[in-house]
């Protein structure tokens, strides 16, 4: 298998995935990517959630379009300066059109996106995968063997059960686990600003200790995150003082401590 060209363009690639749905994985992936741009990095965001591609909606770029040049290279959508997005959503005639594909078709589509896209210069590639340990994360792991992984969970035990499967999946495929993110750790009261434990707090810490992986951070719930996603606003940019933004930026800073520098330019 020939190495995808993106390996040469993104010294840091990270698969963001989860064991189950509904944990806010796409929102986390989008805001990590935004946070990296706030730290001056050039970032690509690849949406391989083939059956539920939501990143264009979350980032407010649903109405934009991909372009293809004379060399048959796909050019991503520019979300903001330094952030480029590729999503299968841009290839659908209508947002409500379902994709009914089996595994080999999904693998080939992901391979095409990895090899045919002209990202330009990238420092980081953030890959948003669907929940579970199925075809899409497996394809990414096979096509980008140098990819690292972040597992997103919520505090309740049902989510933690599936989180353990996701961690073991990454270990079986020799993906470097950057760590786990506990999303929705608490709810920030919109009236008094105090945290409310609507789920059991500390699930991320338990997984971190039990599985021997770092806890990258615990992200509190904030009603503004929902509003930002619904209206396509970049949350960490629009609400820099939110405790959730501060928690996300702490995760970003931990990722940057592990950053691989770009290779030296060839003479």
PLM region spans:
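Phosphate-binding/switch loop-helix module in NTP-utilizing enzymes
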Residues: 91-140
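Phosphate-binding loop that captures ATP/GTP phosphates
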Residues: 42-44, 48-92, 107, 205
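Amphipathic alpha-helical transducer elements in NTP-driven molecular machines
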Residues: 7, 52, 103-111, 134, ...
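Extreme N-terminal, non-catalytic leader segments
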Residues: 1-23, 37, 64, 249-252, ...
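Walker A/P-loop phosphate-binding motif and the immediately C-terminal alpha-helix
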Residues: 12-47, 167
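Glycine-rich phosphate-binding loops of nucleotide-dependent enzymes
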Residues: 86, 110, 129, 142, ...
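Conserved catalytic-core segment of NTP-binding enzymes
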Residues: 123-124, 130-228
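C-terminal boundary of histidine-terminating zinc-finger modules
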Residues: 231-244
